[in-house]
Amino acid sequence: MSDTTLAKSFEPQTIESQWGPEWEKRGYATPALDPSRPDFSIQLPPPNVTGTLHMGHAFNQTIMDGLVRYHRMLGHNTLWVPGTDHAGIATQIVVERQLDAQGVSRHDLGREKFVERVWEWKERSGSTITGQVRRIGASPDWSREYFTMNDKMSEAVREVFVRLYEQGLIYRGKRLVNWDPVLLTAVSDLEVVSEEENGHLWHIRYPLADGSGHLSVATTRPETMLGDVAVMVHPEDERYRHLVGRHVKLPLCEREIPIIADDYVDREFGTGVVKVTPAHDFNDYQVGLRHALAPIEILTLDAKINDNAPAAYRGLDRFDARKAIVDELDAQGLLESVKPHKLMVPRGDRTGVVIEPMLTDQWFVAMTKPAPQGTFHPGKSITEVSLEVVRRGEIKFVPENWTTTYYQWLENIQDWCISRQLWWGHQIPAWYGENGEIFVARNEEDARAQAAAKGYTGALKRDDDVLDTWFSSALVPFSSLGWPNETPEMKHFLPSSVLVTGFDIIFFWVARMVMMTTHFTGKVPFGTVYVHGLVRDAEGQKMSKSKGNTLDPIDIVDGIGLDALVAKRTTGLMNPRQAATIEKKTRKEFPDGIPAFGTDALRFTMASMATLGRNVNFDLARCEGYRNFCNKLWNATRFVLMNCEGHDCGFDKPEVCGAGDCGPGGYLDFSPADRWIVSLMQRVEADIAKGFADYRFDNIANAIYKFVWDEYCDWYLELAKVQIQNGTSEQQRATRRTLLRVLETVLRLAHPIIPFITEALWQKVAPLAGRYPAGKAEGEASLMVQAYPVAEPKKLDEACEQWAAELKAVVDACRNLRGEMNLSPATKVPLLAAGDAAQLQAFAPYVQALARLSEVRVLPDEAALDADAHGAPIAIVGGNKLVLKVEIDVAAERERLSKEIARLEGEIVKCNAKLGNEAFVAKAPPAVVAQEQKRLAEFQSTLTKLGAQLARLPA
């Protein structure tokens, strides 16, 4: 193999397009089920089939793929199951918009035809996100890919629903739910975004029924007063205690309602008197239950006033009704005041419409009802079991503080509304008789058999509703492994090893997986939950379409032009008026668009930012730095190949380093530099193993970066050049062997984080390093399934580490002297040195090369050095004294130093004036003040050095 076999520059797309499909074709991700090996498995949180990859996905999958590749290389039975979620609401909206563009509604098509259209769209577009997952280098077992609506997953969903119903843990009832009046469906809390908005607080007079006065009631939603069933005060509020039990007249309605007392009331809010509307407020609903107040619904499902309200308001939209009601209250003298008020407004994340609490018939899972006999945990509720397994340590949260959040949510849990008024999703397996009879069954045939057994022979109609998407997602830990069948995968990979997830879905997905898995399998779904932060922009702002700060990870990988980026950010905005602002911001931030960084640079960036529990403020500048790292690694490999190909690299003897083989006169004569880099490698390997164990991907990335860039490239390669040029054949052989073996180990170490570049380079390096599998031609083996490096303490060599530290200190001192004397890199001058003569002689060839010196002259003592220095700057390193012998014009040098000293003194005066100005320190951003303080310190340090130089010049 010649040195031209490795391209001159790193071209990510070429490598990615070759190796991504190749890994998949070879089936490396399919696990062996070897009972003698440890098992490692992980679930890919199924992305929406409608979706495209976002930065959160890219971050999450970098972490998961890093773990999977690491354990696969450790030789574990490793399974990563991929899948996509049918995403009920999101998918239905996409297809309905397509129909709207054709002037057709789903009701025009009918349910069956509409669902067919959704399946057609899924088949056309569903592979978009899985293709993007592949582009990020993810290596799950694609042969096991599932879709939450496929036959096997649907069977598991029906089985779970039927069993829970038979166990009395699923029921149908009328309860208050989040209702989207545009989509006309219940929605989960996760699909509701509450943000602070400017509103009003209306103070309304409710006359006492006996005519003796009135109560002033504060409300932010006057339209719902039509459904009031009481007004409420705090039981200890002296202002109103005497009125409890009496009645007020409900304005605009011909009803009297009671005055009740409840601890829920905040005496400091408004007047301390609030209205109670159980049918349209979650807190009021609980108050209504406590006080046995029958709710009165006053809104239709599309948020218009219904027939329970006075005739004047019927049919009005809720916000039109608000205006009409306020106007009428004002006309009747019942509107006391209107004040500006900030409040949290819940909006549907898909429609942007204000969500209404609505009383509707829905299906629920009982969260706190004890499970019956015959289940894995009889007498305990699914919530109770979910708390116990975490308290017992069967599931651990990383970072641990998320355990408290998990407890708080489960300890205050409400029954789970699992029905949705949609057409796309798992249709609820319940059939109704003509008189409201309910038959829950796995299929219609079973439902008819149930009905017949109960003496019902009439028509059956299936429930129109579908299940909450989170219901099927909660089953994934076991449904994706073949449940309800007992499969080998269930035995090996349940519980899975770790779940990697953002904190935003601990409640909606994580806890529900724990509930369902413990209830149906008796096992926990996973042993560890690694909770990471959210990916935000460089300023820490949440990435959102409306802010115009989103980044597409594929655009970072492939690059994108400015105009295309602007178009992507300004198309499909919920508020098109934001387009101009977003375009201006984008053109300023990315004047040349986004260059192609490649997958490895993106993954390295994500890993480096994965600190425990913190949000990730993604900065493209960091991405550029890691692309530079990839280039550095590529160029270092080219150097190693060019210096090792066709040479004796010390692999002719299969077994070396026996007695006398690895020292002076042996087959390999390893230098202290060779032993130092190998010793340091052991420490890095140990640090990386700890990083994986602790889920500290930032530490893993930093350890790889610092070792490769700061130690191997910046130091060892330079030392190796000297050894190859000046060493004996045994020393050259040892150096080449070390160059190759350390580089090959680096490629294996870094592979879980940067898989593509490491694979491409390993194909070239491993054969030379004697690490390519026997009998395999180049390209036939893969780094993906090689053994992961493990630290060998016996290779630690503290003496050589100390040797390297002292050599570095001498080289750095020489470089600093060159800087002080303004010597150009091309100017080579002699170094005079005195001190530890043996050490200095050993260091001499390295120092001469690395510090760009013409020679290194070791003098017998300091007196000889001082006599020869002629006032030149001196550096002291340990017991060694160093001086660069440069013939200088003393008068000219004195003048130059004096001018520079005067300039620095002037700069110091300016800095002190700024920092002494209280207004500047108080008003300037902290970063600006810190920068000024840093400038002052640098000026003072340089001034001290120049003063010492001036003092050393001969008179």
Swiss-Prot record:
One Gene Ontology term, aspect cellular component: cytosol
Superkingdom in the source lineage: Bacteria
Places the protein is found: Cytoplasm
Catalytic activity annotation: tRNA(Val) + L-valine + ATP = L-valyl-tRNA(Val) + AMP + diphosphate
Any single GO BP term: valyl-tRNA aminoacylation
Any GO molecular function: ATP binding
Stored Pfam families: Anticodon_1 (PF08264), tRNA-synt_1 (PF00133), Val_tRNA-synt_C (PF10458)
Extent of motif 'HIGH' region: 47-57
InterPro entries given in the database record: aa-tRNA-synth_I_CS, aa-tRNA-synth_Ia, Anticodon_Ia_Val, M/V/L/I-tRNA-synth_anticd-bd, Rossmann-like_a/b/a_fold, tRNA-bd_arm, tRNAsynth_Ia_anticodon-bd, Val-tRNA_synth_C_sf
Group of enzyme by EC: ligase
Binding-site residues for ATP, renumbered to this chain: 545
Keyword vocabulary terms for this entry: Aminoacyl-tRNA synthetase, ATP-binding, Coiled coil, Cytoplasm, Ligase, Nucleotide-binding, Protein biosynthesis
EC number: 6.1.1.9
Coiled-coil segments on the chain, per record: 887-953
Motif 'KMSKS' region per record, residues: 542-546
Swiss-Prot/TrEMBL domain comment: ValRS has two distinct active sites: one for aminoacylation and one for editing. The misactivated threonine is translocated from the active site to the editing site. The C-terminal coiled-coil domain is crucial for aminoacylation activity.
NCBIfam families with a match to the protein in the record: PRK05729.1, valS
Subunit and partners: Monomer.
Function: Catalyzes the attachment of valine to tRNA(Val). As ValRS can inadvertently accommodate and process structurally similar amino acids such as threonine, to avoid such errors, it has a 'posttransfer' editing activity that hydrolyzes mischarged Thr-tRNA(Val) in a tRNA-dependent manner.
Similarity comment: Belongs to the class-I aminoacyl-tRNA synthetase family. ValS type 1 subfamily.
Protein name per its UniProtKB record: Valine--tRNA ligase
Organism whose genome encodes this protein: Burkholderia mallei (strain ATCC 23344)
Gene encoding the protein: valS
